């Protein structure tokens, strides 16, 4: 019995090897990923069915309790019983692809066994679809893994050969011959089939683990390299930056050489051949030009593809990886090797992954840069906005003063020019020192005092050491203008406006107080949050909204405006970060 078991293992080993080789083909990955369709079932049923037919031909033939060994069984006589190994392949198909694939493979094997004939052809043909169907169902019931565990496979593999022996006992015309066959080959067949199924699942699981671990290591390697390259990608492009990048990649990838190019020229070359592969040279390789044009990775497997004019150049092969920015190829990373054998599937996958990650980072940085420019442009637009009514009223005031007080008109005109000049200047800056903001405000207040002499009193309280803190430009003047236009100018008593700038903990608090009419209570929750739908006389809240949006965008949510009414008028308050204000932009 031991000798028979060894013989059966030898025959089954060939089938296991063939089945394992099949699973390494990329098309068979759909079985492991459980992506089963009708087309998949038909295709793989034919493939596994072909292997199961081979399993039938390399089986053994029995006459009674006598075992006949043949290298390849061609036909089976009526007095002979075929004990094939097609059932092993059918069980493998069922475990990998489920009951339908197992059934399909079993039907192919069963139909072929009918043509082989023999005394037990009914049992032999029937066991194959039954084994495939039952193994597939059992595999789905007992395991949700991509590949069943070996222990479960061992358990499931016991039942199909037992069922096979039962069918032979029932369907063989001569019951005595059936008993002799089962006694002779029953136990060895159960042992070999179940262990074969176990060995196959172990082989698949080990191969998958190795592949996934290798992929994880290469992915981690690519991510690590990309992370180290990120600071260089943030810098302005140029030959110096390209050389830094080439040195980094050369160190991390452990290859013969590396070059970085733009669309037409070599920017940097590090490693072997740097004595004749010089920066500034035009792209020579046909494959490099093809990679730039088509945007797909190219591989030079032969030294002739590198097209180097130096006879003894040690660079034999290369991978050319296109780098994208916003969907357009901007250059290449060329990875050079000493031998073509070094360009493995792992190296190609790493090169592709590295190119994709670097391209995504470059595109992300470009998008972030454009977003920042758009944000800055929006801020400039908000900062440069001037209330047209203020200009019209000031021009009207100057026109009126020219008749009665030309000197005062000249003074107001000078203040207006300073105000306008400051307004244009701050449009180019994100943050300005507080003293410049106060100068801008003072120019505005000079004009206001001329318009409302002895009607409005303003005072500003600030410590000298706070004059250098930074503040978004055109913040105080619109707040003061809003207070005067919608509060103080409508008051019957003399208007008083006070600005207090004080340090509190790590912040600078700026508070504007006035004794005007205050804000409508229903508007307080939304002031500064969005523009209002008001008529021209009541205002639309654009000024407060613009200021609040700039404060939030530049300094964060903590610096937003807080607006409330007081017993004597209204109060507008916000804070500036004291220690970090110069590091915001």
Swiss-Prot record:
GO terms for molecular function: ATP binding; phosphorelay sensor kinase activity. Keywords: ATP-binding, Cell membrane, Kinase, Membrane, Nucleotide-binding, Phosphoprotein, Transferase, Transmembrane, Transmembrane helix, Two-component regulatory system. It catalyses: ATP + protein L-histidine = ADP + protein N-phospho-L-histidine. One of its GO terms (biological process) is cell wall organization. SUPFAM superfamilies: ATPase domain of HSP90 chaperone/DNA topoisomerase II/histidine kinase, GAF domain-like. The keyword Membrane applies. It is a multi-pass membrane protein. Residues 362-580 form the Histidine kinase domain. GO terms for cellular component: plasma membrane. It is found in: Cell membrane. InterPro entries: Bact_2-comp_sensor_kinase, GAF-like_dom_sf, HATPase_C_sf, Sig_transdc_His_kin_internal, Sig_transdc_His_kinase_LytS_TM. Gene3D superfamilies: 3.30.450.40, Histidine kinase-like ATPase, C-terminal domain. Member of the two-component regulatory system LytS/LytT that probably regulates genes involved in cell wall metabolism. PANTHER family: SENSOR HISTIDINE KINASE YPDA. This is Sensor protein LytS.
